[in-house]
Every structure is written in C-alpha cells, then in structure tokens.
Curated annotation (Swiss-Prot):
Gene3D superfamilies: 3.10.50.40, Porin chaperone SurA, peptide-binding domain
Lipid attachment in record (S-diacylglycerol cysteine): 27
GO biological process assignments: protein folding
Organism whose genome encodes this protein: Clostridium tetani (strain Massachusetts / E88)
Bilayer topology: Lipid-anchor
Enzyme class: isomerase
Gene Ontology molecular functions: peptidyl-prolyl cis-trans isomerase activity
Keyword Cell membrane: yes
GO cellular component, one term: plasma membrane
InterPro entries assigned: Foldase_PrsA, PPIase_dom_sf, PPIase_PpiC, PrsA_foldase, Trigger_fact/SurA_dom_sf
Its biological purpose: Plays a major role in protein secretion by helping the post-translocational extracellular folding of several secreted proteins.
Protein name (record): Foldase protein PrsA
Length: 339
C-alpha cells in the first residue's frame, strides 16, 4: 500500500510537470495580435505606463521604422541583421519618452500654466502643418499615416517640448556663472581662445598600459630614438608607416588629454605617460607655432554664456535623475516587449 502511494505521488508530480511544460510551450507558440503588441508595456513611470504602440508611433522613431520596413521588409523584430541596432535606437527613444513623462508628472507640482502650454502647443502644431503640409488637413493625416505616427503622437511630441522648457526654466532659474568661474575656465582652456590657429608637430608611442608607457619614457630619457621605439611597440595602427610621427595638427583636432599635455611641452621635450581613450601616450614635441591668445575680457561674456548653458543642462539632468528615482521608473521587466 505504501509503495502504491509513493507511485501515485510520483505520477501526480510528473503529470503536473508535464501539464506545466505544455502550458509554457503553448504560451510561447501563441502569436500576439497587433493590438496586443501595441498595448504591451515597455516602461512604467509612476502610475503612467508607456506602451509599445506609444513608443512605435513616437514621431522620430516612427519615421525610421517606416524607412527600415521599406528597406528590410515587414517584421523587423525577426531580422537578425538589424535587431541589435533596432533595440539600441528604440531604447534611446524610450529614454526620451520616460524623461517627458517625468516632466509631465512634475509639471503639475510646479504649477505650470496649462492654458499657456496649450496655446503654445496649438501654435507650434499650426506652424508644423502650414510649413510641412500647406495647411492641408487631409494631406497632414495621410502623411502621418505613411510615417507610421498619429495626430495624438505629434501633439504629445510638441506638448513635451513646451512643458520641458517650462519645467526647465523653474529648475534652473537660480543657476549662475560668475566672472571667477569664467576666468578659471579661460585659464584651463586657453588654447581654445587663440587669435591664430597654432599647430603642433609631435611624435608619440602609444601602448596599452601605464607600466609599458613608463618603460618607454625611461628608454627615451636614455636617448633612444622614438621612431625606433614606435615601430617596435606602438599600438597606433599608423606607427609602422610613420614611426609615430603625427605631423602638424591644431589643438582642436587632438583628443583633450593629448592636447592638454602637448601645450605644456617645449621643443624637444618628452611628456610623462598620458592616458586617453586609446591607451597611454608618451609624446615628444618636435615643433610648435607661436601663439597669440585672445584677451579674457574680449571672450568673457561668451564663456559665461556657454558655461551657463552647460551648467543648466547638468542641473536639469540631475533633477531628472532624482525624479526618476522618486517615481520608481521601471523598464527592466518590460525589455522583451520593446521589439
């Protein structure tokens, strides 16, 4: 009897496992309808759910999807050639939509004037229709359909622009840049404020690690030829042909760490190892032009203006990140719905 009970338990467990696996397989075999796909969530921002349909009809994305469908055919999600790029592009657009939903949510707390927003949105929509469609409502609707977007998506797009601007004004209203900050920036970036455009003639050896760069520096300090070392060790693809000789180049054409190091060198001097996104450089300055700098007072206001815009963007982006945490933005569990 005990043996029979054990067998019954085993049979029940096996039957349950079989039924469960069949139900899972069945779920995977069922194709979602276009309507179900459109309603699939791709992100949640507070209480607001962004759906796949809203994402795919977002004007910038919709136009690109239409072009890709013309080029690669109907179901882009099954095209291995472009799948990764499609996911990346959609994720970028979704991030933009998330930011917009955050701004919509917070605009109520900040008491943004809705009547003013609506008036500005209607004005922008009219300009868009007049300039792109000569005010022809039927052509407007027809072309939006061809683009894969909707009137509702276009209106939301313009509304997001207006509300973002209004919210941003409130967030960054206290941001200031004083003369001292501008002066500090001028001194640190002096070579971007030159009357002429001086060039620098340099040779370098590029290696992967700081330790390797230190060894290169030691060999150069002992008098070894940089051309010989560049041909031997440099990971710069052009080094085999040019022996590390970069020719003459202006400050603006160099990556910043390299440029900042080279301006401190005198002719014939060799730098300490310099890290950039390419690796570690050891640089020898062959020659450089004489340089004349613009007077600080002549560029002060432009510097302040540029720094102010940069600081405003920084403050606004930080606020968005703060709000994102407050609203518990969720995208991870909806990743499978993005394509």
């Amino acid at each position: 009897m005990k043996h029979l009970k054990n067998n019954t338990k085993k049979f029940t467990a096996l039957l349950f496992a079989l039924l469960f696996s069949m139900s899972i397989a069945g779920c995977n075999m069922i194709e979602k309808t276009p309507e179900a796909i459109e309603k699939s969530p791709v992100a949640k921002v507070g209480k607001k759910t962004i759906t796949r349909g809203e994402l795919d009809t977002y004007p910038i994305l919709a136009e690109q999807l239409t072009k890709l469908k013309e080029q690669f055919g109907g179901d882009l999600s099954k095209n291995a050639e472009i799948k990764d790029q499609l996911i990346q592009f959609k994720s970028q657009v979704l991030e933009q939509m998330i930011q917009e939903e955050i701004v919509f949510e917070k605009s109520e707390e900040l008491k943004v004037d809705n009547a003013k927003v609506e008036k500005e949105v209607e004005k922008n929509l009219k300009n868009f229709m007049d300039q792109g469609f000569q005010g022809n409502k039927d052509k407007y609707k027809e072309d939006l359909k061809k683009m894969g977007t909707t009137e509702e998506s276009i209106k939301r797009f313009f509304k997001a622009q207006v509300i973002t601007e209004e919210v941003s004004k409130q967030v960054v209203k206290d941001v200031k840049v004083d003369d001292n900050t501008a002066k500090k920036h001028y001194e640190e970036s002096k070579y971007t404020f030159t009357v002429n455009k001086p060039t620098f003639h340099a040779q370098h050896v590029l290696v992967k690690t700081e330790e390797e760069a230190k060894k290169v520096k030691a060999r150069l300090d002992k008098g070894e030829d940089i051309k010989k070392i560049a041909k031997e060790l440099s990971i710069d693809p052009s080094a085999k042909e040019n022996s590390g000789d970069l020719g003459k180049a202006p400050y603006s054409s160099m990556v910043k760490p390299f440029a900042d190091a080279i301006v401190k060198l005198n002719k014939g001097e060799i730098s300490q190892p310099v890290k950039s996104q390419f690796g570690y450089h050891v640089i020898k300055l062959i020659d450089k032009d004489e340089v004349t700098f613009k007077d600080f007072n002549s560029v002060k206001e432009q510097i302040k203006k540029d720094l102010l815009e940069t600081e405003k963007r920084k403050v606004f982006n930080e606020k968005i990140e703060q709000w994102k945490k407050e609203l518990k933005v969720e995208t991870k569990k909806y990743e499978k719905n993005i394509i």
